């Protein structure tokens, strides 16, 4: 039996402060039962590190950041964590190739029914110089697949790409 958080409404993640999207994402993960985020760093993922450090400083809920060296190892660690602890775990990996590196562990997660939130980075979509966080370097133009979710879609209950109009805390709480 998988441990789930019982809540009266989906807005329970709003019990904590959030100045940035990342603050809401890490709070929603922790409040949804995720104690560990198995993390493979990438240029588009530094916000996880910043948000978790900020949460720890301000006494807000956030999962423990477990730095990993490879995406396949990260997903397998999350699977083991979910199996042993009987609660959800999460991974965050580099855009495109990082998602591909999850490999056959995606099949294991799906067929075993293990509660793992798999997140991948994405390049900025705003034109360079148009706003904070807009595209900058050339690599951001070539590492973005047309549909990154397609890589894992057959082996997941749900996939969602956060867009500017989304409420990130609400989306993470729904995904969990």
Q: What residues fall within each predicted segment?
A:
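N-terminal alpha/beta PP-like core and its mobile active-site loop of ThDP/TPP-dependent enzymes
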Residues: 2-176
């Amino acid at each position: 039996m998988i441990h789930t958080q019982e809540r009266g409404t989906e807005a329970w993640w709003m019990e904590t402060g959030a100045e940035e999207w990342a603050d809401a994402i890490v709070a929603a993960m922790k409040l949804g039962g995720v104690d560990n985020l198995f993390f493979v760093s990438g240029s588009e993922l530094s916000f996880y590190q910043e948000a978790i450090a900020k949460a720890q400083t301000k006494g807000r809920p956030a999962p423990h950041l477990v730095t990993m060296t490879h995406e396949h190892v990260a997903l397998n660690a999350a699977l083991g964590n979910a199996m042993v602890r009987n609660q959800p775990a999460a991974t965050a990996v580099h855009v495109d190739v990082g998602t591909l590196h999850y490999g056959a562990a995606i099949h294991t997660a799906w067929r075993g029914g293990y509660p793992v939130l798999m997140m991948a980075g994405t390049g900025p979509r705003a034109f360079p110089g148009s706003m904070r966080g807009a595209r900058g370097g050339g690599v951001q133009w070539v590492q973005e697949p047309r549909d990154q979710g397609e890589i894992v879609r057959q082996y997941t209950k749900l996939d969602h790409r956060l867009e500017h109009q989304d409420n990130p805390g609400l989306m993470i709480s729904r995904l969990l």
